A protein has these predicted regions:
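A contiguous, basic/glycine-rich beta-loop/short-helix subdomain that forms a polymer-engagement track
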Residues: 227-242, 260-261, 340-447, 510-512, ...
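Conserved RecA-like P-loop NTPase helicase motor core
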Residues: 447-459, 507-609
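SF2 helicase catalytic motif II
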Residues: 247, 252-253, 264-300, 378-380
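Long, low-complexity, compositionally biased intrinsically disordered regions
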Residues: 1-143, 147
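Walker A/P-loop
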Residues: 144-166
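Conserved interdomain hinge at the start of the Helicase C-terminal
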Residues: 395-400, 445-485
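A substrate-engagement module of RecA-like helicase motors
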Residues: 112-121, 171-247, 253-255, 307-343, ...
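Conserved helicase motor "Helicase C" RecA-like lobe of SF1/SF2 P-loop NTPases
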Residues: 481-510
Length: 629
C-alpha cells in the first residue's frame, strides 16, 4: 500500500486523500465509543483493511493512537495520519494532526459471551453488535463515580441485557423500573432471578375475604393490627423483592414506595427503562383527581364555583381539616373492637379507607397545587389538577438511586431529559448504533398536502385518500398500518377509501387490542387505521410490511396542559418539538424489529422536510440514514 503525501501542505497537514478515505469510511460505518476519547471502528475490505476492527484513542488536542500501527506494515507510516484517526476525528469533532501506535489497548471489562457473567442465563451466548461496548462504557462510568448515564438504544440493541449485565458484573443490587406489567413479566421471563412486585391492588385482602377489598385497601395499622399480616401475599412478595439482587417494578409502584414507604429507595443501581416516559409517569403520579362520588361518600361539598381554580385553592385547607377530624373519629371508633380483640365491621373499615384516601389527596393538594397548575374543571363529575412542569418534583425519581441508568429507543437528548426532571448533575450520554441495514427500513417522503389544523380541509383530505389508495394498490398483498394521528383523518379515510374491505379500526373492531389481534391473526392483507398506535406495538415480519404516517404528530394543543407548556417560553417550545421528533421515531420503529426484517415507512405531510431540517440534529443517526429524499 502506498501513501500519497504529495498534496500534504505542511508537516502537520493531512493529505486530502486521507480525508477522502476518512469520509468514505464514515459513509459506510460509524465509530463506537468505548470510553472517554476511546473508540472502536469497524474495518472495511473495500478500503483494504486487514482487520475487522480498530481501536483508537485521542488526547483531544490532535494526537491520536490507532491499533493499525500495531499491525503488519504500520511501522512504515511513521507519523502520518491514518484514515481511521481522521474518520473518528471528523465524527467526534476533534482535531487530528498525528497518529501513533496505540500505547495500550483498553482493558476488556466483560467476558467474551454474556452468559459468562454469573446470573446471566445460558441463552445469552453472544453479545449483540455494540452491546459489549455499551456495557463497558457503563462500568467505566460507575468506576469513575458517574451517577447518571443516559443510553439511547434502538430496537434490537438488547437494552435489558445491557443494563442487567453491567449491574451483575459490578455486583450491585438493582431496581429495574418499567412502564407496564407486561414488560415486568417479560424481564422476569428473560432473567429467572428477577423478582417482580406489582402494586398492592393486584393482591387479595386476606383479612376481609369475600369482598372486593385488595391489599391496596390494607387496614393493618398499629391501632388496628391485621391478624393475617404474616400471611399477606403482597407483603411476602415485597420481602422477596427487597431481598433480591434484581427487583422489577413499574413506575407507579416505585414512585409510591420510594417516596412514602422507602423500601426501594437508595439501591446501588436504579434503571429507568423507556426513560423518555419517566417525566410523564411522574406527571401522572403528582397529578390529582377529585370526583363528585368520592366527596359525597365522605359527605363533603365541592366549592360553590367549581369551575374556578381559585375557589378550589380556598376550599382545600378547611376541607382537609374537616376530613382529618372525621378520620380521627373513625379511628377512635375502632378502639372498642380492639380492646376485646374482635374484628371491626367491614363497613367501618371501608369508611375509614375512604376518608384516609381523601385525606391523602387533600394533603397533597394543599402542599403542591397553586395558580400555576393546570385545572380541568368543566366536568361536573370529576375535577383534575396537573402541574405544567414536574422539574420541582424530579427528586421523587432522581434521588432514590446511588447510580441511575436511563435507557430508551428515543432518549434523543440527555440534556433535555435531565432538565425536565430537574437533574442538574452531569449526565453521560451514549448512543448505540442500529444494526438494522438502512436499505431494509427506508423512510420515504411523498408530499401530499399540508395537514396542519388550518389546512386539513376537504381538498387536503381527498388528496390524502388518493395517495393512500395508490400505496395500498402498491402493497396489495401485504399488511400494514396507517398512523392517521387524528380521529378526523382516520374517519375520513375509512369512509372514502376504495380499499374499505381491507381497512380495520378501533371502532370497527371494538378495542385497540381487538383491532391489533385481527391484524396479526388474519391471513388477509388487512391494514390497521389508527390515530394512536405510534408506540408499544410490535409488528415484525409479515405482521406489517409498510406503514403510512399521514400527519406530523405534533402534541395536541387542544389539551390545556400541552398548550400552557408549549407557550411557556423557549423551554416549552423545545419540549413540544422534541416530543414530535420522539413520536415520529417511535412510529418508524413499529414495523422493522430485527436485522433481517424489512418494511417501508411513508410520510405524507408536506411540512415534513421543513420540520426534519429544523430538528435534524435531534433525530438519531439510524433514523437519519434511512430517510429518502
Amino acid at each position: 500500500m502506498t501513501w500519497d503525501m504529495a498534496n500534504r501542505k505542511s508537516e502537520t497537514d493531512i493529505a486530502e486523500s486521507t480525508w477522502e478515505r476518512a469520509r468514505r469510511r464514515l459513509s459506510k460505518t460509524k465509530p463506537h465509543a468505548l470510553a472517554d476519547r476511546t473508540w472502536l471502528l469497524s474495518g472495511l475490505e473495500e478500503l483494504d483493511d486487514s482487520y475487522k476492527e480498530y481501536e483508537l484513542s485521542s488526547d483531544g488536542e490532535g494526537l491520536w493512537y490507532c491499533s493499525c500501527y500495531d499491525h503488519y506494515g504500520g511501522e512504515v507510516r511513521r507519523e502520518e495520519v491514518c484514515s481511521h484517526s481522521a474518520a473518528v476525528a471528523l465524527y467526534a469533532g476533534l482535531p487530528c494532526q498525528r497518529t501513533r501506535p496505540l500505547k495500550e489497548k483498553p482493558k476488556r471489562l466483560t467476558p467474551d459471551w454474556p452468559c459468562g457473567i454469573p446470573g446471566i442465563p445460558g441463552k445469552y451466548s453472544r453479545w449483540r453488535p455494540h452491546q459489549r461496548e455499551a456495557v463497558e462504557l457503563i462500568l467505566r462510568q460507575w468506576q469513575s463515580n458517574g451517577k447518571y448515564i443516559a443510553l439511547d438504544a434502538p430496537t434490537g440493541s438488547g437494552k435489558s441485557l445491557t443494563a442487567i449485565a453491567a449491574a451483575k458484573l459490578a455486583g450491585l443490587k438493582t431496581v429495574y423500573c418499567v412502564v407496564t406489567k407486561q414488560l415486568q413479566e417479560q424481564i422476569a421471563s428473560d432473567f429467572p432471578d428477577a423478582i417482580v412486585i406489582w402494586g398492592r391492588e393486584n393482591y387479595p385482602c386476606l383479612r376481609f375475604t369475600n369482598t372486593e377489598l385488595t391489599a391496596g385497601d390494607c387496614t393493618h395499622r398499629k391501632y388496628s393490627p391485621c391478624p393475617k399480616v404474616n400471611q399477606c401475599t403482597y407483603k411476602s412478595q415485597k420481602h422477596r423483592a427487597l431481598a433480591a439482587d434484581l427487583a422489577v417494578v413499574n413506575y407507579s409502584f416505585f414512585l409510591n414506595e420510594a417516596n412514602y414507604v422507602g423500601g426501594f429507595s437508595g439501591w446501588p443501581v436504579l434503571v429507568f427503562d423507556e426513560a423518555d416516559r419517566a417525566e410523564g409517569e411522574l406527571m401522572k403520579f403528582v397529578s390529582l383527581t377529585l370526583t363528585r362520588q368520592q366527596l359525597e361518600r365522605c359527605q363533603i361539598e365541592p366549592p360553590e364555583y367549581k369551575t374556578k381554580l381559585d375557589a378550589w385553592l380556598k376550599w382545600a385547607e378547611p376541607t382537609l381539616s374537616k376530613v382529618g377530624g372525621e378520620l380521627n373519629r373513625l379511628e377512635a371508633g375502632l378502639e372498642p373492637y380492639l380492646e376485646v380483640e374482635k374484628e371491626p365491621p367491614v363497613e367501618l373499615m371501608r369508611e375509614l379507607i375512604r376518608y384516609q384516601r381523601l385525606h391523602s389527596k387533600l394533603k397533597m393538594f394543599t402542599t403542591c397545587v397553586d395558580a400555576r397548575w393546570v385545572s380541568e374543571l368543566d366536568d361536573p363529575e370529576k375535577w383534575q389538577f396537573k402541574p405544567t412542569f414536574v422539574r420541582s418534583f424530579g427528586h421523587m425519581l432522581a434521588e432514590h438511586g446511588q447510580r441511575i441508568l436511563a435507557m430508551s429507543a428515543t432518549m434523543l437528548s440527555a440534556r433535555d431529559w435531565a432538565y425536565n426532571l430537574g437533574i442538574e448533575d452531569e449526565v453521560t450520554f451514549h448512543r448505540v448504533p442500529s444494526t438494522f441495514p438502512r436499505e431494509n427500513r427506508p423512510v420515504i417522503h411523498l408530499p401530499t398536502a399540508d395537514f396542519s389544523l388550518k389546512s386539513a380541509n376537504g381538498e387536503a383530505l381527498m388528496l390524502m385518500v388518493r395517495m393512500v389508495d395508490g400505496l395500498l394498490d402498491k402493497h396489495k398483498a401485504q399488511k400494514g398500518i396507517i398512523h392517521a394521528v387524528s380521529y378526523k383523518i382516520a374517519k375520513y379515510l375509512l369512509e372514502h377509501s376504495r380499499h374499505q374491505d381491507r381497512l380495520i379500526s378501533h371502532s370497527e373492531a371494538g378495542t385497540r387490542a381487538e383491532a391489533l389481534r385481527r391484524l396479526i391473526e388474519s391471513e388477509m392483507p388487512l391494514v390497521l387505521v389508527s390515530p394512536s398506535f405510534g408506540r408499544g406495538v410490535d409488528l415484525f415480519g409479515d405482521r406489517a410490511r409498510f406503514q403510512i404516517c399521514v400527519k406530523i404528530p405534533f402534541p395536541d394543543l387542544g389539551d390545556k396542559q400541552t398548550a400552557k407548556r408549549r407557550w411557556s417560553g423557549k423551554a416549552g417550545e423545545r419540549w413540544y418539538l422534541l416530543e414530535t421528533v420522539r413520536a415520529i421515531v417511535q412510529m418508524a420503529g413499529r414495523i422493522v424489529r430485527s436485522a433481517d426484517d424489512w418494511g417501508v415507512t411513508y410520510i405524507l405531510d408536506e411540512r415534513w422536510p421543513r420540520f426534519y431540517h429544523q430538528m435534524e440534529r435531534d433525530f438519531p443517526l439510524w433514523f437519519r440514514e434511512a430517510c429518502v429524499w
